[in-house]
Every structure is written in structure tokens, then in C-alpha cells.
């Protein structure tokens, strides 16, 4: 069980840098 929780945390950290790149295109979506 604890091993699965650690793996889920690693996936969340990888999603954070991808979201920062989406923020650049998010400005166009707000307009």
C-alpha cells in the first residue's frame, strides 16, 4: 500500500512541470 502512494506522488510531481507549460497557452484561453 505505501509503495503505491509513493508512486502516485511521483506522477503528481511530473504533472506540475507540464501544467506550467499549459499556463502559457492558458492565457490565450482566458481571452
Swiss-Prot record:
A GO CC term attached to the entry: nucleus
Where does this protein chiefly localize? nucleus
List, in alphabetical order, the GO biological process terms annotated in this UniProt record. Answer: cell differentiation; chromosome condensation; spermatogenesis
Q: Where does the entry say this protein is expressed, by tissue?
A: Testis.
Cellular location(s) = Nucleus; Chromosome
Instruction: Cite the GO molecular-function annotations of the record.
Output: DNA binding
> Per the record, which residues fall in region Disordered?
1-31
Keywords, A to Z, come to: Chromosome, Developmental protein, Differentiation, DNA condensation, DNA-binding, Nucleosome core, Nucleus, Spermatogenesis
Q: What does this protein do?
A: Protamines substitute for histones in the chromatin of sperm during the haploid phase of spermatogenesis. They compact sperm DNA into a highly condensed, stable and inactive complex.
What is the name listed in the Swiss-Prot or TrEMBL entry for this protein?
Protamine PTP4
What organism is recorded for this protein?
A: Oncorhynchus mykiss (Rainbow trout)
